[in-house]
């Protein structure tokens, strides 16, 4: 009998903090399953989930404002430990009889809290000692309001000069509140505090590990599809690749992968995908050479969103045609991951600002009569990569820089032509190769080349030429929500520019993009 890896579980209620998904990832890193739900869930839903503990996230609202979010009352009557983080601590304090006030002294950034009372949450945890020998913790604050009176039954565990209740605890009921963010790396002992809460106080077992996740996924796939066949669109990206490997392990040759070469891929990418998954791993792959079809559909179109829609529509058409040829196929597999599910749920309930719709959720043709298999839908991206390694996929493929779904279709500015794609592919390959050679590839978060639809005069030998311009883009970021342009060495940039202009006939000038996000986006289109 396979162990139930979902048996021990934490429920995280989301009050809108930008860090909430990070809380969930940190809990998962401890080896414990958790789910992220909107703050206004019902008692019946919480009972149905049956968590070992509940975490109340931070949030941008003020608890002192009328109508601001509150935790369901059942949270405090469920008989399980509760940890309130920042806003979560404030709503806990107010709902249990304490007091919160707005403060003129907004605390944002690094702070040092002094531990006053021993607590299960911070037992044996410290960063330094005060002059009087009290333990000190380096933490990351981000709040305006603060708790000014704690509820009955609570005690002050830690404080700062401006925040009298930085940590509060009711040890008997196992309720804890922290006015800082333990999930961010700036709180140096934050992960140890979460470990104290999840493993010690909630008494969860670390059952959520890559090997066990794979076993669980394989069993669930077999249970879901039985003896049926499955079809998957394989792009060579992380999510579809790991999905393919899981399905292949579960059902072997009953998986058919459709690889659509749309002519918008990186240099030699189609050959690499076919060699890795077909030759090395023995998957059934249908290779559809559809470059002409995509480029014909894109001809004359220069508006970025219209190009995205054309590429998406043609992909669905091509994939649908191939699926219809596979008469025995009953299931469609997709590489949907947990953040896609969270984003779609938030979009449906109107509880989050959605920047753009995700291609994996809701992008299927309505007439497709296949069941849906989504083996990664409980996993964050970092977890997908870890199980990819466990399944034997190469590190450099799993940790490659992100590549947009529409591919070079949004890296060739304006109208997309084969000539432009071919030039861009070669220029981009040189940039990436040089980043690897200089040991800079893993020091930047994303790097790529953009084709600009402008010509520039150049001099080659005794002659002048009038050729195309490309831009190099490299950024450093933690979450891709904001990014800094990467300060690559001048001699490195000079070397890349030299190689591109000399080796790629048709390019006369190379520029470097020094725009941050905001105001610019990472991709140009």
UniProtKB/Swiss-Prot annotation:
| EC number(s) given by UniProt | 6.3.5.2
Look up the record and name the pathway of this protein. Purine metabolism; GMP biosynthesis; GMP from XMP (L-Gln route): step 1/1
Query: What HAMAP family does the annotation carry?
Result: GMP_synthase
- Specify the enzyme's EC class, one word: ligase
Pfam families, per the entry: GATase, GMP_synt_C, NAD_synthase
Which PROSITE patterns has this protein been placed in?
GATASE_TYPE_1 (PS51273), GMPS_ATP_PPASE (PS51553)
Q: Name one GO molecular function term.
A: ATP binding
Gene name tied to this protein: guaA
Show the GO cellular component annotation of the record.
cytosol
Give the GMPS ATP-PPase domain ranges. Answer: 208-400
Query: Keywords assigned by UniProt?
Result: ATP-binding, Glutamine amidotransferase, GMP biosynthesis, Ligase, Nucleotide-binding, Purine biosynthesis
- Give the organism's phylogenetic lineage: Bacteria, Pseudomonadati, Pseudomonadota, Gammaproteobacteria, Enterobacterales
Provide the protein name.
Answer: GMP synthase [glutamine-hydrolyzing]
Q: Which reaction does this chain catalyze?
A: XMP + L-glutamine + ATP + H2O = GMP + L-glutamate + AMP + diphosphate + 2 H(+)
Q: Which residues form the active site?
A: 86 (nucleophile), 181, 183
Question: From which source organism is this entry?
Answer: Pectobacterium atrosepticum (strain SCRI 1043 / ATCC BAA-672) (Erwinia carotovora subsp. atroseptica)
Tell me where in this chain the Glutamine amidotransferase type-1 domain is found: 9-207
Classification via PANTHER family: GMP SYNTHASE [GLUTAMINE-HYDROLYZING], GMP SYNTHASE-RELATED
Residues at which ATP binds: 235-241
What interactions and quaternary structure are annotated? Homodimer.
Q: What does this protein do?
A: Catalyzes the synthesis of GMP from XMP.
């Amino acid at each position: 009998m396979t162990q139930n890896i979902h048996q021990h579980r934490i429920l995280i209620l989301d009050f809108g903090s930008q860090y909430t998904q990070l809380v969930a990832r940190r809990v998962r890193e401890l080896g414990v399953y958790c789910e992220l739900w909107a703050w206004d869930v019902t008692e019946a839903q919480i009972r149905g989930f049956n968590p070992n503990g509940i975490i109340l996230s931070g949030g941008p609202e003020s608890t002192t404002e009328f109508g601001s979010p509150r935790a369901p009352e059942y949270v405090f009557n469920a008989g399980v430990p509760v940890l309130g983080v920042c806003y979560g601590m404030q709503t806990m304090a107010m709902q249990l009889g304490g007091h919160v006030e707005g403060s003129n002294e907004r605390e944002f950034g690094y702070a040092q809290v002094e531990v006053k009372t021993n607590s299960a949450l911070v037992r044996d945890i410290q960063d330094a000692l005060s002059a009087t020998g009290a333990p000190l913790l380096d933490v990351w604050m981000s709040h305006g309001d603060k708790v000014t009176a704690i509820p009955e039954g609570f005690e002050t565990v830690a404080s700062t000069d401006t925040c009298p209740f930085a940590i509060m605890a009711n040890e008997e009921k196992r309720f804890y509140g922290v006015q800082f963010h333990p999930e961010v790396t700036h709180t140096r002992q934050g992960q140890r505090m979460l470990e104290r809460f999840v493993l010690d106080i909630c008494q969860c077992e670390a059952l959520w590990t890559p090997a066990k996740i794979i076993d669980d996924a394989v069993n669930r796939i077999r249970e879901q599809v039985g003896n049926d066949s499955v079809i998957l669109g394989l792009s060579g990206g992380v999510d579809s690749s790991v999905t393919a490997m899981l399905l292949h392990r579960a059902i072997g040759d009953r998986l058919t992968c459709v690889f659509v070469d749309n002519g918008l891929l990186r240099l030699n990418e189609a050959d690499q995908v076919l060699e890795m998954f077909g030759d090395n791993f023995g998957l059934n792959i249908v290779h559809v050479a559809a470059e002409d079809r995509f480029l014909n559909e894109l001809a004359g179109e220069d508006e970025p969103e219209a190009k995205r829609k054309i590429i998406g529509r043609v992909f669905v058409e091509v994939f649908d045609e191939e699926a219809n040829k596979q008469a025995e196929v009953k299931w469609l597999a997709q590489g949907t991951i947990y953040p896609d599910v969270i984003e779609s749920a938030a979009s449906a309930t109107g509880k989050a600002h959605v920047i753009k719709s995700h291609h994996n959720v809701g992008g299927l043709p309505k007439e497709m009569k296949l069941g849906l298999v989504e083996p990664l839908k409980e996993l964050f991206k970092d977890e997908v990569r870890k199980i990819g390694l466990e399944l034997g996929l190469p590190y450099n493929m799993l940790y490659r820089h992100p590549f947009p779904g529409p591919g070079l279709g949004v890296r060739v500015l304006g109208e997309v032509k084969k000539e432009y794609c071919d030039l861009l592919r070669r220029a981009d390959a040189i940039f990436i190769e040089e980043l690897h050679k200089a040991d800079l590839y893993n020091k930047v978060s994303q790097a790529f080349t953009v084709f600009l639809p402008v010509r520039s005069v150049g001099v080659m030998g005794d002659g002048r030429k009038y050729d195309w311009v490309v831009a190099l883009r490299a950024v450093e970021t933690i979450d891709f929500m904001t990014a800094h342009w990467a300060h690559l060495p001048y001699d490195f940039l000079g070397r890349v520019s030299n190689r591109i202009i000399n080796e790629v006939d048709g390019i006369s000038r190379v520029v470097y993009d020094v725009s941050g996000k905001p105001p610019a986006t990472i991709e140009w289109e």
